[in-house]
Amino acid sequence: MLSEHGCKIAPNTYYMAKTRGISARARRDEYLKGEIDRVRAENLEVYGADKVWAQLNREGIRVARCTVERLMRDMGLSGARRGRAFKVTTCPDERQARPADLVDRHFIAPAPNRLWVADLTYVKTHAGWVYAAFVIDVFSRMVVGWQLSQALRSSLALDALEMAIWNRTRAGQVLDGLVHHSDRGVQYLSIRYSERLAENDIVASVGSKGDSYDNAMAEAFHSLYKWELIYPQGPWKGLDDVEYATLGYIDWFNHRRLHGEITDDNSYVTPAEFEAAYYRQAGPALEAVTQ
């Protein structure tokens, strides 16, 4: 065919090209595509190129970030893109006395159990709204307590707090002096909630401005929760299936999801790994103080 169009190619050149087979680079690309698919499947299919690259290298699969980016483009893959949806879950009572804002939008903590943030969000289901309460440790971004309910009741937030207290004290961790930050919602200003904080020597802090930036870290988690779990896997039937999925999501979020905002150098690490590293380093110092 080529010779008919004036292309002079030696027969041996043609047959060598035809029988050469797949190149080493092409074989490597096919292998990496399979690994990319696996990593994404193990992580709710929400990872973009950066996290896929980080996870592959954590597993000893050495590959350049640009290679992962190229292959994911070829595969038509991208990470979860976050947007914003809004439904009011805060019911402020402007007449009620509230604690001071001890955080002032500076969501930084030098160690675990120095600063928790708590907030409520919502999930639309065929059976109506499901409301979710979360408590997050600012140091590691670990979700330490959570609870779901079909009603936006005061006990919803309290149940999440109880789980957080139980999780930390069960591990032998001290909560004295911990600051608990929330918005102005009546759920967090209730008498029983305030009493439970005081019983554990936890100091209450409430945002002073009355907008989403008052509790930006909790809002950021809600965005991840929605765009990594709720929207991709919906629609939802009701409370039971949302609760079951949330249980798996929190376990993944705390122990396997890579976070790039926790460390000073923006390296990827899980909340559980970050806390474990802190206690390994702080252990000798804590022992020296108590001796």
For every predicted segment, state its role.
Residues G172-L189, S208-G210, T263-T270:
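Acidic/histidine-rich, metal-coordinating catalytic segments
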Residues P11-A111, V269-A282:
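Basic, flexible linker segments flanking DNA-binding modules
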Residues R81-K87, L148, V179-R184, A198-M217, ...:
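RNase H-like polynucleotidyl transferase catalytic core
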Residues I191, A198-I202, K226-Q291:
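C-terminal domain-tail junction helix/linker
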Residues L120-A151, E162:
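Short conserved beta-strand segments at catalytic cores or DNA/RNA-binding microdomains
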Residues M1-Y15:
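Structured, non-catalytic alpha/beta "coupling" segments that mediate domain-domain communication
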Residues Y14, I36, V52, V68, ...:
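Mobile genetic element proteins and their domesticated derivatives, centered on retroelements
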Residues R95, G128, Q147-G172, L189:
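Active-site beta-loop-alpha junctions of metal-dependent nucleic acid enzymes
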